[in-house]
Swiss-Prot record:
GO BP terms: DNA topological change; DNA-templated DNA replication; response to antibiotic
Composition bias, Acidic residues: 813-823
Gene source species: Staphylococcus aureus (strain COL)
Protein name according to UniProt: DNA gyrase subunit A
EC number: 5.6.2.2
Alphabetized GO MF terms: ATP binding; DNA binding; DNA negative supercoiling activity
UniProt xrefs under PANTHER family: DNA GYRASE SUBUNIT A, CHLOROPLASTIC_MITOCHONDRIAL, DNA GYRASE/TOPOISOMERASE SUBUNIT A
Length: 887
């Protein structure tokens, strides 16, 4: 049995072997496969493909050659890896949607934006593009170093001359071991302008460079949102750039719209993007899309059409598509490249500095090469001049020599010529002895002397060499530069907020006594005449009822003030939209209320930063406070203190004011005080406040509102038993803050205590809610106007154990006058309550919730006649009461 060759077996620790082998592998991937060189922006495989094309003479003016021939030559000579990796790299360089400036001119199927693969290499053909010649220009003039190929039988370039900044022009991406690179493409004109600026000012800042280089310029065009991501990437080498499709909303007749996408983000697969949209529509995550089709063609370019339903908001759908599909995506910049053979994270300026230094080296080495060649030629011409001056002696010497070697030696010795000069004389043809040829040699020699002087001047002065680099870059810019494709949109577009995805519409937010909250479109409720039955606004739990109601836009802010003096904030759209009969969700699921905390007031505000608005607070014990609205612009999720007060007190209401109004405070025993808001000094957010009204025993504040000085507004009073009236504000004289107030209604067993005191103009509608959850909407103008001491008229006939819980005013709409028979539909629920719905309101003014109680009425004619008679008797009683008061 033969013995094993022991000398070939080396025992090693497996840990050391794994460490060293993996390190060798990692360095091989990093240096020789995955990362581009900072000088020419190419990985080895791309560099070898382009050099192979150049060696095979596949220039733009020559015919196409089979891709298989190119791949085979590159694989056999320079790249000892699979043919598929070489072909895929070449295909990518030929795709105008992958490379901003394609380096390969492909003929045949080279793939598409839909992710279709290229045809097999035996079917496609390729050659270099014109701009590729600039990467290879002067490669044979000793401008770069050549190295041995993998088997030592060929030579290949270690880097290309790269006469334009290809690293940034076409970008690069690659995954190495422990690192990755992702560099976006840029516009060639901007890049060269940036290099020129850098060459003139080496201390230029990145901000100044960005005046020339606006940002990435993707081959698929599209939009870039904002410059903050670009600036961060240029300054640090890392950053995220938001890309967005270019889409327009077009009218398609019949009041319908469609979204047309004409440009998509870089590296987005169009087919998958369309599939994603279809999936979202199928899963009902995006509503309102009726049709989706791809109309892309060579004639129209990219064109994806999304038809929108007639009643849908196309802008909101588009914003949802941006957020949930690749119509908007980000490009993660990670500018890692090989610098002196080592991977390094570089910023924009460093990339341009390294490129500029490379160009200076290329031009310097080319100049040195040209100088050597020029001097060699001048040396030969000097020998020829000597020969022409001594032609007879030269001929005689040659004729006397027995061999070429003897003739060469004789010429060198006799005429002091070098070996090269002697050889050139021996190689000279007889026709060059003519006078014309003599003149040509003399002219060429003189030109060479001038050329040599120019080359030496370039090498002697760095600024002259730099100017030559500038001139050549300018020439390339003028030949190949083009307009920017990608538009950079400025101004807060980095991220889509939730608000951008929500249609702006008028809504009603209701809050029940047991703290259930929900929102509904304001069109859910329609106007009815005074005494109407009402619309079922919610199905409440046993002993629960609507206690707060406010109208606003989905994009407005809602401030929630609690009885404990705290404030919370939500956007209108953050309150869940539920059905009209739904009870809502627990308010603690929307805002983080503390124990025993109840919402006392909801206020809708458009601009929390306003310096012209104030909030006025009133507590049950008659304390008031005025504070600037801007103090409440930053409210945390868990709320903040809005007002401080004693333990036996609580917050009753808050009102939004302009700072120049009159304050009205009403009590349950029908006292009302009116005083100027200016008498309230603005206090901080957490301040306690001052006395607003002096209360009688057993009395408490139930209402707070504001009125303009000398206004024609009226005070609306509603009692718990469903009675109400209007009284001009001017019937209530101005008094000093802290007084007891004056009488605003006569309290009887029929009326009950006051539950609502607010101001109206007579042009509003009134939303009235009962503890049974019934909501009615009526015109304020239908409510009788009476004196201060009057009891009021019946607004709603309440059932047993019913009382008014909430009253809120909303903007009157002309559509409210539409005939009910034409516009409304009604159904009767199991409990006999009529439920009606009609789209009539477009309320643009956020309303204030009013801390009060509700209303109901009859439908048949007999009940209507009874109601009229009751109103007449009410007025008679009021007149009698007024006469008694005057006496």
């Amino acid at each position: 049995m033969a013995e094993l060759p022991q000398s070939r077996i080396n025992e090693r620790n497996i840990t050391s072997e794994m460490r060293e082998s993996f390190l060798d592998y990692a360095m091989s991937v990093i240096v020789a496969r995955a990362l581009p060189d900072v000088r020419d922006g190419l990985k080895p495989v791309h560099r070898r493909i382009l050099y192979g094309l150049n060696e095979q003479g596949m220039t733009p003016d020559k015919s196409y050659k089979k891709s298989a021939r190119i791949v085979g030559d590159v694989m056999g000579k320079y790249h000892p890896h699979g043919d598929s990796s070489i072909y895929e790299a070449m295909v990518r360089m030929a795709q105008d949607f992958s490379y901003r400036y394609p380096l390969v001119d492909g003929q045949g199927n080279f793939g598409s934006m839909d992710g279709d693969g290229a045809a097999a290499m035996r079917y496609t053909e390729a050659r270099m593009t014109k701009i590729t010649l600039e990467l290879l220009r002067d490669i044979n003039k000793d401008t770069i170093d050549f190295i041995d190929n993998y088997d030592g039988n060929e030579r290949e370039p270690s880097v290309l001359p790269a006469r334009f900044p290809n690293l940034l022009a076409n970008g690069a991406s690659g995954i190495a071991v422990g690192m990755a690179t992702n560099i976006p493409p840029h516009n060639l004109t901007e890049l060269i302008n940036g290099v020129l600026s850098l060459s003139k000012n080496p201390d230029i800042s990145i901000a100044e460079l960005m005046e020339d280089i606006e940002g990435p310029d993707f081959p698929t065009a599209g939009l870039i949102l904002g410059k903050s991501g670009i600036r961060r990437a240029y300054e640090t080498g890392r950053g995220s750039i938001q890309m967005r499709s270019r889409a327009v909303i077009e009218e398609r007749g019949g009041g319908r719209q469609r979204i047309v996408v004409t440009e998509i983000p870089f590296q987005v697969n169009k087919a998958r993007m369309i599939e994603k949209i279809a999936e979202l529509v199928r899963d009902k995550k995006i509503d309102g899309i009726t049709d989706l089709r791809d109309e892309t063609s060579l004639r129209t370019g990219v064109r994806v059409v999304i038809d929108v339903r007639k009643d849908a908001n196309a802008s909101v759908i588009l914003n949802n598509l941006y957020k949930q599909t690749p119509l908007q995506t980000s490009f993660g910049v990670n500018m890692i490249a090989l610098v002196n053979g080592r991977p390094k994270l570089i910023n924009l300026k460093e990339a341009l500095v390294h490129y500029l230094e490379h160009q200076k080296t290329v031009v310097r080495r080319r100049t040195q090469y040209n100088l050597r060649k020029a001097k060699d030629r001048a040396h030969i011409l000097e020998g020829l001049r000597i020969a022409l001056d001594h032609i007879d002696e030269i001929i005689s010497t040659i004729r006397e020599s027995d061999t070429d070697k003897v003739a060469m030696e004789s010429l060198q010795q006799r005429f002091k010529l070098s070996e090269k000069q002697a050889q050139a004389i021996l190689d000279m043809r007889l026709r060059r002895l003519t006078g014309l040829e003599r003149d040509k040699i003399e002219a060429e020699y003189n030109e060479l002397l001038n050329y040599i002087s120019e080359l030496e001047a370039i090498l002697a002065d760095e600024e002259v060499l730099l100017q030559l680099v500038r001139d050549e870059l300018t020439e390339i810019r003028d030949r190949f530069g083009d307009d920017r494709r990608t538009e950079i949109q400025l101004g807060g577009f980095e991220n889509l907020e939730d608000e951008d995805l929500i249609p702006e519409e008028q809504i009603v937010i209701t809050l029940s006594h047991n703290n259930y909250i929900k929102r509904l479109p304001v069109s859910t409720y329609r106007a009815q005449n005074r005494g109407g039955r009402g619309v079922q606004g919610m199905n409440t739990l046993e002993e629960d009822f609507v206690s707060q109601l406010v109208t606003l836009s989905t994009h407005d802010h809602v401030l929630f003030f609690t009885n404990k003096g705290r404030v919370y904030k939500l956007k209108g759209y953050e309150v869940p939209e539920l059905s009209r009969q739904s009870k809502g969700i627990p308010v603690v699921n929307a805002i983080e209320l503390e124990n025993d905390e109840v919402i006392s007031t909801m206020i809708a505000v458009k601009d929390l930063e306003s310096e012209d608005n104030f909030l006025v607070f009133a507590t049950k014990r008659g304390v008031v406070k005025r504070s600037a609205l801007s103090n409440f612009s930053r409210i945390n999720r868990n709320g903040k203190i809005a007002i401080s007060f004693r333990e036996d007190d609580e917050l009753i209401a808050v009102r939004l004011t302009s700072g120049q109004e009159d304050i009205l405070i009403g009590t349950s025993h029908a006292s009302l005080i009116r005083f100027p808001e200016s008498t309230l000094r603005p206090l901080g957010r957490t301040a306690t406040g001052v006395k607003g009204i002096t209360l009688r025993e057993g009395d408490e504040v139930v209402g707070l509102d504001v009125a303009h000085a000398n206004s024609v507004d009226e005070v609306l009073v509603v009692t718990e038993n469903g009675y109400g009236k209007r009284t001009p504000v001017n019937d209530y004289r101005l008094s000093n803050r802290g007084g007891k107030g004056i009488k605003t209604a006569t309290i009887t067993e029929r009326n009950g205590n006051v539950v609502c005191i607010t101001t109206v103009t007579g042009e509003e509608d009134l939303m009235i809610v009962t503890n049974a959850g019934v909501i009615i909407r009526l015109d304020v103008a239908d409510i009788s106007q009476n004196g201060r001491a009057a009891q009021g008229v019946r607004l709603i006939r309440l059932g047993d154990d019913q009382f008014v819980s909430t009253v809120a005013k909303v903007k009157e709409d002309a559509e409210d006058e539409t005939n009910e028979d034409e516009q409304s539909t009604s159904t009767v629920s199991e409990d006999g309550t009529e439920q009606q719905r009609e789209a009539v309101v477009n309320d643009e003014t956020p309303g204030n919730a009013i801390h009060t109680e509700v209303i109901d009425s009859e439908e048949n004619d007999e009940d209507g006649r009874i109601e009229v008679r009751q109103d007449f008797m009410d007025r008679v009683e009021e007149d009698i009461q007024q006469s008694s008061d005057e006496e």
